[in-house]
Amino acid sequence: MAGVRSLRCSRGCAGGCECGDKGKCSDSSLLGKRLSEDSSRHQLLQKWASMWSSMSEDASVADMERAQLEEEAAAAEERPLVFLCSGCRRPLGDSLSWVASQEDTNCILLRCVSCNVSVDKEQKLSKREKENGCVLETLCCAGCSLNLGYVYRCTPKNLDYKRDLFCLSVEAIESYVLGSSEKQIVSEDKELFNLESRVEIEKSLTQMEDVLKALQMKLWEAESKLSFATCKS
């Protein structure tokens, strides 16, 4: 019949196939197509899973680094300051006894100081502005006698918060964060080169160079004698 295409199975049967494989031709082609599509989907899913895993790992690493930086910053903030004499570097006190800082007088107030701070028992009246009636005792470094500031012994009512506090001049002290030093003892096998060791190494290299030159000269003489003997024979 015109316009009608004869359908045949794998055995050559026509559309009205009576063999047992009826419909298996089309089923096998559909199955292959579905398997191909499933394979493509599986590959795509694997690709997405790989990308998601990579992104998750990167995010996890970034979170860990951020947390580590935050911990280090918090630890740095919690480390106390140690105040040193600017003349001899003796420790005078630390920020654990910190009370306040005064920008107008350029000093800091501490509740207590170390034994390196000497107190002059001779009392005198303060000559600073807004400190009328304050009785002071001079503070000096026990090591180098540098004037460090004052301790308030008597104060008017409006300055009672300064009484028995140690006022250290910022110009007379230095400070560093406790635990901030990164210097470590270097073992003998990792000791850094200094000037003396460099001189010794250069001396040894010069001696080795002289020995090599002497050996080269002897080798040249031996080759010359051998060449002369060969020519003579």
UniProtKB/Swiss-Prot annotation:
Zn(2+) binds at C85, C88, C141, C144. GO terms for biological process: cell division; CENP-A containing chromatin assembly; chromosome segregation; pericentric heterochromatin organization; protein localization to chromosome, centromeric region. It is found in: Nucleus; Chromosome; Chromosome, Centromere. The keyword Ribonucleoprotein does not apply. GO terms for molecular function: identical protein binding; metal ion binding; protein-macromolecule adaptor activity. Detected in testis. Residues 80-178 form the Mis18 domain. The modification Phosphoserine is found at S36, S39, S40, S233. There is a cross-link at K162 (Glycyl lysine isopeptide (Lys-Gly) (interchain with G-Cter in SUMO2)). One of its GO terms (cellular component) is cytosol. InterPro entries: Mis18, Yippee/Mis18/Cereblon. PROSITE patterns: MIS18. Keywords: Cell cycle, Cell division, Centromere, Chromosome, Isopeptide bond, Metal-binding, Mitosis, Nucleus, Phosphoprotein, Ubl conjugation, Zinc. PANTHER family: NEUROGENIC PROTEIN MASTERMIND, PROTEIN MIS18-ALPHA. Required for recruitment of CENPA to centromeres and normal chromosome segregation during mitosis. Belongs to the mis18 family. Homodimer, and heterodimer with OIP5/MIS18B. Identified in a complex containing MIS18A, OIP5/MIS18B, MIS18BP1, RBBP7 and RBBP4. This is Protein Mis18-alpha. It comes from Homo sapiens. The lineage of its organism: Eukaryota, Metazoa, Chordata, Craniata, Vertebrata.
